[in-house]
């Protein structure tokens, strides 16, 4: 019956200003990361690879929306 117990949802990750600044800086140079670079950033910022991957996915979507708005396409 353990399969009936719902799994707890992960809490929302909050990033420090330093982490956000470093991630934004990296995004400015590269919108896509290699696995090696993702590992390096994760170690440097004390985050998991998964957190870095998801942050970049979310940031690319934000960038895409901002560019669509700037060019006037929906």
Curated annotation (Swiss-Prot):
GO cellular component labels: nucleus
Keyword Ribonucleoprotein included in the entry's annotation: no
Keyword terms of this UniProt record: Developmental protein, DNA-binding, Homeobox, Nucleus
GO MF annotation list: DNA-binding transcription factor activity, RNA polymerase II-specific; RNA polymerase II cis-regulatory region sequence-specific DNA binding
Location (main, coarse): nucleus
Subcellular location: Nucleus
Family: Belongs to the Antp homeobox family.
CDD domains (UniProt xref): homeodomain (cd00086)
InterPro entries, sorted: Antp_homeobox, HD, HD_metazoa, Homeobox_CS, Homeodomain-like_sf
DNA-binding annotation, residue ranges on this chain: 8-67
BP GO annotations: anterior/posterior pattern specification
Gene3D superfamilies: Homeodomain-like
Coiled coil: none
Keyword DNA-binding: yes
Organism: Apis mellifera (Honeybee)
The protein, known as: Homeobox protein H90
Highest taxon listed in the record's lineage: Eukaryota
């Amino acid at each position: 019956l353990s399969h009936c117990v719902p799994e707890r949802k992960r809490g929302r990750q909050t990033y420090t200003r330093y982490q956000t600044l470093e991630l934004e800086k990296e995004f400015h140079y590269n919108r896509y990361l290699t696995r090696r670079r993702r590992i390096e950033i994760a170690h440097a910022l004390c985050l998991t690879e998964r957190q870095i991957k998801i942050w970049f996915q979310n940031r690319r979507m934000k960038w895409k929306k901002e560019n669509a708005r700037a060019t006037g396409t929906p």
